[in-house]
Amino acid sequence: MDKIVIRGGKKLKGEIVVSGSKNSALPILFATLLTDDPVMITNVPSLTDIDTAIAFLNFIGKKTVKEGNTVKAYSSYKYKHIAPYDLVRKMRASILIMGPLLVRLKRIEVSLPGGCAIGARPVDIHLAAFKKLGAKISVKGGYVKTSAKNGLKGATISFRVPSVGATENILLTAVLAKGKTIIKNAAREPEIEDLANVLTKMGAKVMGAGTKNIEIEGVDKLHGFMHEVIPDRIEAATYLIAAAITKGGVILKKVIPQHLKSVNDKLKKCGLCIKETKNTISAEWVKNLKPQNVKTEAYPGFPTDVQAQWMSLMCLLNGESCIEENVFENRFLHVSELQRFGADITVNGKTVNIKGVKEFSGAPVMVSDLRAGAALVLAGLAAKGKTVVSRIYHLNRGYDMLEKKLKKLGADIRIIHN
């Protein structure tokens, strides 16, 4: 199993280009199922989740190829209506196959999805919404069987929580359903807006994406598109924290600063010097930073996908801080690994209390999920001595060219291939 070896204590300095957003690229890839016309998607990151999605599309019957950071999808073969466990288990976003295939084939069987082991990420919100649109659903033998023999009809759907995946799935479905669909308490993430922009390019009628209420007027047919995926705000946040935790300075290019407002506001309060232009962010350590409490929330609040990285930083700041996780349960699996570096952390339900320590000592650690892996790499970069990070396949799901980018910033990091 591959490992990352880090010799920490170096200040990271330099410039990097932020990759395209995985969380935007995945639903856009599944949107290609809504048309038989050619499509081209650029700024697609090179990640195992992207490879899995492309393999998935080809299996279903959509000819899809990736060359560099560009994905092209062509006219479809006859689509399969079954998405098997062997493919679905690798990636939670595979649940997004349901909407496009249901609206086009009027039936779909999808194995319950996999992904990171970070607590309950229920699909019941998706299924309840499909029922509102007129689908019949049964769950048997680990598969969700969904059918709509008479087609789908628009409806008003109110989510109990602003689920990103469910919002995307209903967007992908309602654009070809009959009549108007209204999504209330919709997710507001930038990735939702990016998907809506793609659907609009395809000829869909979508209004209100990026707000709590989205309206979709169904159309009869969608056509091809060209689109550049937005930058990855979570990757960008991770490198900003890397500058802070190593007392260095980085310049991020090809980034959208407004997508990182909640993170940047907290970093500024810590004392990190942050400057923004239209598509760049610079972050520089100029003085000892002060800890700041955070509560994770749906966008535009502080992102749950930055919680673990933030924890690594707080562990090394003089003083006490608190992190409250309000989005996912069981998302503190990285705590025990950070304690191996010397972190002073106490878990109390959905809250962690942190007492800053003077320094970390390098240690062997194990990754439990994607963002936990990023937190451990950050800790290793700041620690004295050697850190060995195992189970790095999680990192390959969400960080494009991680080793190369960190080396460019001056990190002593290498991957050992076993």
Curated annotation (Swiss-Prot):
GO biological process entries: cell division; cell wall organization; peptidoglycan biosynthetic process; regulation of cell shape; UDP-N-acetylgalactosamine biosynthetic process
GO MF terms held by the record: UDP-N-acetylglucosamine 1-carboxyvinyltransferase activity
Gene3D superfamilies membership: Enolpyruvate transferase domain
Gene Ontology CC terms: cytoplasm
Protein residues bound to phosphoenolpyruvate: 22-23
Modified residues (2-(S-cysteinyl)pyruvic acid O-phosphothioketal): 116
UniProt entry tagged with the keyword Cytoplasm: yes
Keywords attached to this entry: Cell cycle, Cell division, Cell shape, Cell wall biogenesis/degradation, Cytoplasm, Peptidoglycan synthesis, Pyruvate, Transferase
Involved pathway(s): Cell wall biogenesis; peptidoglycan biosynthesis
Localization, UniProt: Cytoplasm
Catalytic activity reported: phosphoenolpyruvate + UDP-N-acetyl-alpha-D-glucosamine = UDP-N-acetyl-3-O-(1-carboxyvinyl)-alpha-D-glucosamine + phosphate
Transmembrane parts of this sequence: none
The enzyme's E.C. designation: 2.5.1.7
InterPro entries the UniProt entry points to: Enolpyruvate_Tfrase_dom, Enolpyruvate_Tfrase_sf, MurA_subfamily, RNA3'P_cycl/enolpyr_Trfase_a/b, UDP_GlcNAc_COvinyl_MurA
Domain of life from the UniProt record: Bacteria
Residues at the catalytic site: 116
Residues reported to bind UDP-N-acetyl-alpha-D-glucosamine: 92, 305, 327
Family listed: Belongs to the EPSP synthase family. MurA subfamily.
Function in brief: Cell wall formation. Adds enolpyruvyl to UDP-N-acetylglucosamine.
Name under which the protein is recorded: UDP-N-acetylglucosamine 1-carboxyvinyltransferase
